[in-house]
Every structure is written in C-alpha cells, then in structure tokens.
Amino acid sequence: MHIIKTIKVLYREIKILKKSNKKIGLVPTMGNLHDGHIKLILLAKKYSDIIIVSIFINPMQFDNLSDLKNYPKTFMKDSIILKKYHVDILFFPHINEIYPNGIEHQTFVEVIKLSKILEGQSRPGHFRGVTTIITKLFNFIQPDFAFFGEKDYQQLLIIKILVKELNYMIKIISLPTIRLKNGLALSSRNNYLSSQENEIAPYLYKIIKKTCEKIIKEDDNIRPKIIHESKILLIKKGFSVDIFDIYDYKNLEHPSKKVKKVILLASVWLGNTRLIDNKKIILNY
C-alpha cells in the first residue's frame, strides 16, 4: 500500500493510473475505521482496479470544536486494516495540504436546498464542509466510482446531487447500513457511548422498525400519531429526539399522498453522542 500525504504526489500517481486505463474507486473516510468501512472497500473491489481510501478529519464539517478535538485519531490501526484488505493507495493529507489558507478563507461548495434542512438545520455548515472536501477529493483523484454508506442518507443524496449538477463523470455507489447483531448502526461515534448507553442505543433501530411497520399498516391520517408515540417512547428510553419523521425518498420533502417510496429519518442524542439512522418504506395506497 502506497501512503500519499501530498496533492502533488497524488496527482502524479493518478496521471500514471489514468494512462493505464485503470478504473479507480474512492472510499472517503475520516479514519477510525470499522466493519462498515471494510464492507465499502470490499464493494469497491468489485468495481475498481485500484482502490484509494482517504483519511482526513475534515474540520470544515464540524459544527462543534470539542467534537472535532475529541474525534478518534487511529491512523496506525487504520493503516494496518487497509493493508490487510489490499488497498492500493491511502491518501492521508495534513490539514495545511487541504486548506493552505485556512478554513475561513476557503472557497466552498454547497448543495443549496438539501444542505439547509434536517441535519443541515441542526448542524449549520456541516454539509457545506462535506461537499467542499468531497469536491476536492474528486478533483484530486478523478475516480470512476465513489462509495458511501446509506446510514448518512441525507449526505448520500447531497453527494449524488453534487455529482449531477457539477457534471462529474463519477458513479456513486451506496452500501446499505451495516449493523451489529443488536441492530445498532455502525458508526465511528459509537466509541463515545458509555457501557450503559451501549445497552440503550439499539432501541433506536428497534423503534424505527416498529414505527415503519405501523405506518405501512395504518391510514395516512394516523401517521402523525404513530410518529408522536414513537418519539415519546424514544424519550422514555433516554434519547433526546432531534429528527424522527418520514420523508420523500427522492428529495427529503414531506411526502404527498401520491408518493410511495419514503424513508424514516432519525437523528437523536444519547448522552453526548449523536446517533443517526433510517429505514426505507414502500407505502401501500
């Protein structure tokens, strides 16, 4: 595995790979790798000749400085994992390489509408940071494919819009959420959970599933009551609820009666840890 820390060296390597007509797959990460990342790498291998994983803890997408400071930095462990799974290139740049003039003076890229709602409303500037670093990585690496998990569904949708509207010739491939046996969605932030919170956290997906089952069975006019009861149940379990509702699968607007494909999005706090999850539903009209 070739570890690259500068854009100049990365450009040189990409130029060689492009001349050889190699299909490049990109898996962007912030490190602290888990089984979800590994599944993305294995998926990338099915499509790509060359696998590039980036590790960059992007300060531009953090709305909380203490969250940025406390984010796990596990480069040695991560590099061992990436070597084990035969990743070709690890791009591990310093912050000054990505933002040489500082974040305050950085030109940014933003998908206007979707970046302002739901998670974007709760975390101002977060998605602007995501789309800016993803745009930079796409420009540096020029991948044929890029791989993202479906747990961060709003982020996935935003990146798909970014690719379409900026005319990138990149295929975005998503991976269904990877879960522990108890149903908890894998996330680097799960490391923040205390032992007691780890016992409570799986209830999030259990309640999501139950809610979806009820929504499918009941009439439209009962839906607000079902959502409200689920929020109360989450609060009783110890969660603080930020987002818990169903949205149009394509645009995250509140669904009209004609829309069949919807998604239940959940964003909650458990102690000091933010957990997000979702489940797709096909409504029976």
Curated annotation (Swiss-Prot):
The keyword Nucleotide-binding applies. The active site is at 37 (proton donor). GO terms for cellular component: cytosol. GO terms for biological process: pantothenate biosynthetic process. Its main location: cytoplasm. Beta-alanine binds at residue 61. Keywords: ATP-binding, Cytoplasm, Ligase, Nucleotide-binding, Pantothenate biosynthesis. Pathway: Cofactor biosynthesis; (R)-pantothenate biosynthesis; (R)-pantothenate from (R)-pantoate and beta-alanine: step 1/1. Transmembrane segments: none annotated. GO terms for molecular function: ATP binding; pantoate-beta-alanine ligase activity. ATP binds at residues 30-37, 149-152, 178, 186-189. The keyword ATP-binding applies. It is found in: Cytoplasm. (R)-pantoate binds at residues 61, 155. It is an enzyme of class 6 (ligase). Belongs to the pantothenate synthetase family. Catalyzes the condensation of pantoate with beta-alanine in an ATP-dependent reaction via a pantoyl-adenylate intermediate. Homodimer. The reaction proceeds by a bi uni uni bi ping pong mechanism. HAMAP family: PanC. This is Pantothenate synthetase. It comes from Buchnera aphidicola subsp. Acyrthosiphon pisum (strain Tuc7).
